[in-house]
Amino acid sequence: MAQLTCQKLCVGYDGKPVLQDLDFEVFAGDYLCIVGENGSGKSTLMKTILGLQMPISGRILTGDGLRKNEIGYLPQQTVVQKDFPASVREIVLSGCQGHCGSRPFYSKEEKKLAADAMEKMQITLLAKRCYRTLSGGQQQRVLLSRALCATQKMLLLDEPVSGLDPKVTAEMYALIQKLNYEDGITVVMISHDLSAALQYASHILHIGDTVFFGTKAAYLNEFPQAWQKGGEVK
């Protein structure tokens, strides 16, 4: 059974669709990269999957034991978020809020979950640092740690390497790949870098003028020019 299924999905704003009749499934352990032109609806799709906005039509179903509150989310950062005056530990712990319910404190288990997430992202030594004093790459590791506190099943990542230099980008991709391969966490990632998507993903969802969903091998078979032209498909 698929963890996530989208059936005849139509998403947009104010009743105006930006993406229509979308069908795809994501299974446990998949690494799906969502690619496409600017304005094609990638971030809108992700927000709709998360329930942050309603679909215009169609269905979004979860299965295989996955509940919507067990999906970790790493959004695109805003300038305000980058200047957030909280400690690294406080931000990572906030990812456990979905487990707390009405309880106004974090349990011992939740604190351990946060500590384990920071260790995986190699930021344990930054726990007491103020978030806004960190580099862009360190901030993204903090936000990924927070997302891990929400789930051990599925991560939704919206441009997780945006604005990072090549070295830090490669390190971030390696950490995400490790979570997928070693921990078995399903990854759904939006990326403008199709060459990276083709390196790491098991499946590709291309939206825009061209709509495609399938395995990486099937994508390369249908669009062989994607690799040759650095991932550009119209």
Predicted features, each with a name:
Residues P166-V168:
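Helix N-cap at the start of a conserved alpha-helix in ABC-type nucleotide-binding domains
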Residues C130-L134, Q138:
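Conserved ABC ATPase signature
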Residues L155-D158:
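Catalytic Walker B motif of ABC-type/P-loop ATPase nucleotide-binding domains
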Residues V35-E37:
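The feature captures the beta-strand-to-loop junction immediately N-terminal to the Walker
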Residues K108-L126:
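Conserved ABC ATPase "signature" region
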Residues H203-K216:
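H-loop (His-switch) and adjacent beta-strand-loop-beta switch element
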